[in-house]
Amino acid sequence: LDSNTIEIKNFGNFPSEFLKKQKKNVKFIFFEKEAKLIPHNLSDIQKNLLRGPQIISSKDIAWIIHNLDLKSGDTIIEAGGGSGALTTALAQAAYPEGKVITFEKSKKHHDIVKINLRLSPFSDQVDLRNEELNEDSPRIECNSIVLDLPEPHKLVSWAKESLVSGGKMVCYIPTINQVENLLSSLNGWGLSLIHISEPTRQDR
């Protein structure tokens, strides 16, 4: 509703000021019919994000959250905030007692994430930092780590020192060369499970 006009399918474009005045879950007359505003959900947030870097798909986000077994009370480290699509989902998964610490070294991308977090009712769970996470960064005790970076293998040592017992790490990488470098860096760390997945998406 930040736009001056809003488009509703099968109705057309009209000034958004009218809807801004309505209260959630309270009926009002709209095009001669009863209507009401309902609270937005994560899917609505994802569809309205300001675009910057390529956004992680909703299917991949769901896979990441499921495999990290995220829950309230967890501390989650995210490196590579991008446009904040994953950040908003992690924040919701960690609510109300958990927190997400997101590192984004690009000022441009950091500012995009900051703007997009305003759409989320769970933004208070996020500590957004305009910093690079690297092997020399101070260790942060955490339950989960998500790396969306070109060279995640350089952070394996940092991750091992930061993760609590039973903690998990997900690396979101697009090329087989990156996978090979990561697997090579994991040798000898005594990890209980290493899993490689290539999610596919089919919208019908």
What is each residue range found by the language model?
Residues 105-140, 144:
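S-adenosyl-L-methionine
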Residues 1-36:
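N-terminal auxiliary segments of SAM/dcSAM-dependent transferases
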Residues 73-82:
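Conserved class I S-adenosyl-L-methionine
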Residues 156-165:
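A short glycine-rich, Lys/Arg-flanked "PGG" loop and its adjoining helix->strand segment in the class I
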